[in-house]
């Protein structure tokens, strides 16, 4: 078994939907990015790719490539799971921490776990999603952006 770690951060801006863990969350601001800017899934993809020694999402889905403009990160995650399968790996579990002052994501976590688990091919209980604040410190504390960390375990098929 192999383990990988991922991190991502995006700026909060008006006029964009807020998507976290594959779920759209009501908010006056969303995350800025080339794709849907889902920091939770981007951190998870980096963790999965890192565990397999396959680089990072910027290598596979460069922000300079118009093909990925507005991409749904669940679709990108499916592609990452496919890349793992080509190398003989499968996801086992993951643990994601979202760092944001608001919105509170607790009510949306069950849907996130379901959606991510379905793409990874694991039971939702194998997908852990937690949230914390930055205690009003730094860019997250000033509500300028949202960050996410992820750890993923993969195994050979």
From Swiss-Prot:
Binds 1 divalent metal cation per subunit. Its EC number is 4.6.1.12. It is an enzyme of class 4 (lyase). Keywords: Isoprene biosynthesis, Lyase, Metal-binding. It comes from the Bacteria. 4-CDP-2-C-methyl-D-erythritol 2-phosphate binds at residues 8-10, 34-35, 56-58, 132-135, 139, 142. Its cofactor is a divalent metal cation. The record marks 34, 133 as: Transition state stabilizer. The keyword Lyase applies. PROSITE patterns: ISPF. GO terms for molecular function: 2-C-methyl-D-erythritol 2,4-cyclodiphosphate synthase activity; metal ion binding. SUPFAM superfamilies: IpsF-like. InterPro entries: MECDP_synthase, MECDP_synthase_CS, MECDP_synthase_sf. GO terms for biological process: isopentenyl diphosphate biosynthetic process, methylerythritol 4-phosphate pathway; terpenoid biosynthetic process. A divalent metal cation binds at residues 8, 10, 42. NCBIfam families: ispF (TIGR00151). Belongs to the IspF family. Involved in the biosynthesis of isopentenyl diphosphate (IPP) and dimethylallyl diphosphate (DMAPP), two major building blocks of isoprenoid compounds. Catalyzes the conversion of 4-diphosphocytidyl-2-C-methyl-D-erythritol 2-phosphate (CDP-ME2P) to 2-C-methyl-D-erythritol 2,4-cyclodiphosphate (ME-CPP) with a corresponding release of cytidine 5-monophosphate (CMP). Homotrimer. This is 2-C-methyl-D-erythritol 2,4-cyclodiphosphate synthase. The gene is ispF.
